[in-house]
């Protein structure tokens, strides 16, 4: 009888993308297994693009919400589904409470927030041995970290052509001209955001060559995207806050080149196999790089970076302000030539 596995997923979009190689490895180790994902509503579309996932179940809890009684009740309901194993990917105590409530015999995950009494297949994370987040996830497919070969596949999403065409029609877009996609937001803070004026300068160059420039992001990113558009003579298409996540994924898959900050959309673009230039400032690609053979990372590698701060502690954000559009354009052109 095939194994049935429940995954309690991370919340952040980028982290969700990086879990896909785990599911592929589970299928390799347990042929014919069934994998269901228990995921927040805002990230469900990510798992729906993964052929390894059988079913996506909505996790109703937001960031920081405890709601202990509700967690226990939902865990008990999940336990009726006949799972053989639950793998808890977040390191939080509250995520493991749900796993305990399910009564599933094998409850797998890292120690995290001292979860010794909640999980019974508990792993101690050797961060030095597994610096990449994707490998930390994939290693959980194996009985021990020592059994993991140290290699994870890259995420790779599926796209439904009809769904993509519907998204294009809904937003009045066409693919008759090459598309440059900008993802100018970064949820963590301004120290991860390349300046609007740099995005705009790069956009103007591509617009002059007959390209389209589409701007992607949430409603929170609308203001910076609008600034980029205004600095580009209003010739860009600002999609920030106008698409839901499934539409954003479909439309991003149309892009010929993507330029973005270290963000969830960066990981989506990588999983969609787009030519991708990832701009790094306060963060580091050593832990969560774009997982794609078509990605180039651009960073000044200043002595003060990565600082991992939301805002520049020195007040200048030179790591991004001094990273010129020329550098990013050169990386994009190198990708185009290698295609």
Predicted regions located by residue number:
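Catalytic machinery of carbohydrate-active enzymes
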Residues: 1-339
């Amino acid at each position: 009888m095939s194994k049935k596995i429940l995954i309690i997923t991370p919340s952040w979009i980028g982290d969700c993308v990086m879990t896909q190689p785990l599911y592929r490895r589970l299928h390799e180790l347990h042929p014919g297994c069934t994998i269901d994902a228990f995921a927040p509503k805002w990230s469900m579309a990510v798992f729906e693009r993964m052929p390894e996932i059988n079913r996506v179940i909505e996790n109703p809890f937001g960031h920081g919400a405890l709601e202990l009684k509700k967690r226990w009740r939902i865990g008990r309901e999940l336990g009726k589904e006949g799972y053989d194993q639950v793998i808890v990917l977040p390191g939080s105590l509250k995520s493991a409470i749900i796993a305990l409530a399910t009564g599933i015999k094998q409850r797998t995950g890292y120690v995290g927030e001292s979860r010794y009494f909640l999980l019974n297949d508990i792993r101690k994370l050797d961060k030095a041995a597994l610096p990449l987040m994707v490998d930390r996830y994939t290693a959980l497919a194996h009985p021990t970290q020592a059994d993991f070969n140290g290699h994870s596949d890259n995420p790779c999403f599926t796209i439904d052509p009809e769904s993509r065409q519907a998204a294009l029609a809904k937003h009045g877009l066409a693919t008759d001209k090459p598309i440059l996609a900008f993802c100018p937001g970064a949820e963590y803070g301004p120290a991860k955001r390349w300046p609007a004026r740099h995005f705009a300068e790069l956009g103007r160059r591509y617009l002059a060559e007959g390209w389209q420039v589409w701007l992607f992001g949430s409603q929170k990113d609308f203001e910076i995207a609008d600034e980029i558009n205004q600095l580009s003579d209003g010739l860009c298409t600002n999609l920030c806050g106008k698409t839901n996540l499934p539409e954003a994924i479909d439309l991003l898959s149309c892009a010929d080149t993507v330029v973005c900050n270290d963000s969830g959309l960066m990981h989506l673009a990588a999983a969609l196999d787009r030519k991708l230039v990832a701009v790094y400032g306060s963060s580091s690609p050593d832990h969560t790089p774009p997982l794609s053979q078509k990605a180039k990372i651009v960073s000044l590698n200043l002595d003060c970076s990565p600082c991992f701060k939301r805002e520049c502690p020195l007040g200048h954000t030179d790591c991004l302000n001094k990273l010129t559009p020329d550098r990013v354009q050169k990386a994009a052109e190198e990708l185009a030539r290698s295609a």
